[in-house]
Amino acid sequence: MAENPYRLTEDDILEPPTTFSGKLRFLGPGFILSASIVGSGELFATTLLGAKAGFVCLWVIIFSCLVKVALQLEFGKHAIYTGRTTMQALNDLPGPRLGRGHLSIWIWLLIMSFKFLQVGGIVGGVALIFMQIPALADFGLIWWTLFTSLVVAVIVSVGRYGFLEKLSLIMIGLFTIFTLVSVIALQWTDNAFSGAEILSGLSFQLPTAAVIIAVGAFGITGVGGDEIMAYNYWLLEKGYAAHTGPRPGWTSGEAHDIWLRRARGWIRVMTLDAMAAMVCYTLVTVLFYILGAAILHRNGLVPAKTEMISQLGTIYTESLGPWAFGIFLGGALVVLFSTLLSALAAWARLFSDAFSQLGWGNFQDPESRKKSVGTCAFVFPAIWAILFLQFQAPGLMVIIGGVASAFILLIVVYAAVIMHRKWAPRELEGGQFYKTAFLLSSVAIVAVAVISSAKALGWIS
């Protein structure tokens, strides 16, 4: 791995693997992304949508997971052929500026203030899991909230990319097994589902009462705006851009052709990484939706405040026995903690880089970056803990964050269009299928943001 992956030099150039097995050895950024994606959105937003709408909105979840990948690929391509971070790219966008920063960075900072509620809800979700265990409940909610915040802060402050990648892979395996077992176990309960019910969820219907929850679920399931923005940092730290090397100053000749070949090769590796992540989080997200539709919707339950985890766990206990409750709690803990860990690692980098673009620090300098990331690793969990203890409504907090994520996607769309239309080398633009998928992603995201805005303003009920 490059000594400083955020700076491209000739010394770190590496030819991309050409075989499938060779490419598999270089996968990794998608692991961290999947660990971040599969968590609060699934345990809270996805199950809430299933509880309110039943199986009929299953297609919304699948669409949400599939449609945003083209934007993720565009951001990833940009990182590989330029070596620039997300915030460096935003700061170079055309449009108005405020001080040293592009307006998009300031808007992102404003929207992210609402996202603090979302991750505060995740911290609370982890604390509530500990509170479900009689032997641990005596410590109290405040203690477990602070404990959760401290543990994740310590891990992120000392963990580097390789450690985060391995830990994410372990958690992905655990929560995938957990969700599969949970859904399969349903078939031995009164809440068993049928193939006809699954097919009814692919009928492209959307009840009016479920519109705002569907919008929130769209923002928070699948790859979200903040996760697309964070993906570049994991690609850079894995070394994809460093292995591609700096782009020659001229656009023709042997050196440029060699660079193009390397860039295409590492973009193919990145595409495989993104597709593998998509398969993983789509599968787990669909399974969580089925849990919400089959258990909560059938029983007329729409969990509020701190009841989500306990209601799901109680129904499993009634159907399968006391042993099921412990397994459910363990799985829920892994799911939520994976999101918490990955989100903090990403936020620490995104905010440090954003502050650097505004003139506060130097993200490109390894020592300055390490200090800034370490500081954010402790400050952010403290804020999340305070917010949860103030509101104590993890489900609502996560949904609010999901709506905020839908607006962050607008920034992502604008930046991705500029990358695709103006910045990408002509030879790396992609084929017609990719261009069509990119257009569909952009239109869908803008449409959801418009619906969300109209709902918030009371223009639609």
Regions found by a protein language model. Name each.
Residues 173-233, 413-425, 448-460:
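Hydrophobic alpha-helical segments and their helix-loop junctions in multi-pass secondary transporters
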Residues 70-81, 236, 242-243, 279-310:
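Extracellular/periplasmic helix-exit of transmembrane alpha-helices
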Residues 33, 61-94, 107-118, 342:
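Juxtamembrane transmembrane-helix boundary signature
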Residues 1-43, 216, 243-245, 262-271, ...:
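Membrane-interface "cap" regions at the ends of multi-pass membrane proteins
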Residues 170, 349, 353, 359, ...:
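C-terminal membrane-solvent junction of multi-pass transporters and transport-like membrane proteins
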Residues 6-11, 46-48, 73-99, 130-134, ...:
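Flexible loop linkers connecting adjacent transmembrane helices
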Residues 101-136, 336-354, 394, 446:
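Hydrophobic transmembrane alpha-helices that form the core helical bundles
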Residues 138-147, 323, 327, 355-390, ...:
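Loop-to-transmembrane helix boundary motifs in multi-pass membrane proteins
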